[in-house]
Amino acid sequence: DNMDEGSNLTFTAQLRKRFGFGLNTSLAYTYLDAKNNLQSTEIASVLFQSQPVQGDPNNPNLGYAQFGMKQRIIASATYTHNWSETMSTNVGMFFEMGEGNQYVYSGGNRYSFTYGGDVNGDGVGGNDLIYIPSSASEINLTNSSDWAALDAFIAQDKYLSKHRGEIAERNGLLNEWFTNLDLRVLQNIGIAGQKFQVSLDILNFGNLINDGWGVRQTANPAALTPLVLDSWNDAGEPVFSF
């Protein structure tokens, strides 16, 4: 059935300034908040198996759209100096900063925390969103001594620690902010009515200066399914290993 849920909020602002001495600058900011019930880029059979769900895959909950950065800032500047009618030098800079260099603990632009195994009994493993326990009494572990490690894992993660006592959202997690700076020097040379160009491009220039800059952090795949379904107890409750 068609659904009337879902939303897409996009805000963009841009400033441009051209100076008379050959300098052009631009600064732009974009904010995106998009939610849907289905990851629309998949065919039906693949979508049923791969989309993280909170229970019934036939009635998917509203969740964050998989693609697109939540926030993005870009800035550019170019300067041109004309040495003569046939020779000029152009220096350009492109800077990008974004949140959500994109991950449902399962991959894509956003991430979701999912169980290892088929918890909801739909015949597909690895697509069930986890419940984030607040205490040891809210989860059955094969080894009860693993609670201390699981509790510490939850505490160190910004998303998990904030959503204790809840089922994780589909695509609820984002990668950390990242920055990137690219530089280009372009030399234009005119000889005998012909124009030649020689360019020097330095990608991720910040990382050339400091190896801690210009690094994009992504989720560790091993951490995307922290809980694995081991068995079911006599009460029909799932038992997990961590």
Role assignments for model-derived ranges:
Residues 1-242:
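Short, solvent-exposed micro-motifs at the edges of structured domains
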